[in-house]
Amino acid sequence: MKIRYWLLAMSFIFLSCGRVADDVEANYGIIPMPNELAPMQGVYVLQGKKTVAVPSGEAAMKVFHYLEDALKNTSVTLKGISETGKADICLSIDNSLPNEAYTLEVSSDRINISSNETAAGFFYGVQSLLQLMPAAIYDGDRKYEGKIRIPAVSITDAPRFP
């Protein structure tokens, strides 16, 4: 009889452990969890030389340099341009978004981060983008030479608390 209870308890423990792993995969590992996250089909591969459309203004330029610095330990080279149509990564201004809000769209051929003209929204969008990348790019001891595979996703987020 004791063996039956012991087996039942152990089964419960093993089955409950599997759900935690599923939940971690479902949220894409972004902390804090965005208000809206819609997984999409495909993967964006970040490697080699990429262009980044940077709107005029100090806020977007600071965030561009932050992204450039975050990827310095990889083989990716970023070049800032002003033409949005030809860019691999596009920072764009959307004044319909509230302060500090952003949208992040990752498709198989492009990354787009939109925010109003404040640096905070662009910064939060870049933070979410960086969290979608493999942790190995942050290893300061050696350069990450592999392809950076970013899952396709659509995110809309804004601060929950004023």
Give the positions of each predicted feature.
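Acidic, contiguous N-terminal accessory segments
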Residues: 17-161
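Positively charged n-region of N-terminal signal peptides that target proteins for export
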Residues: 1-5
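Bacterial N-terminal signal peptides
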Residues: 7-14
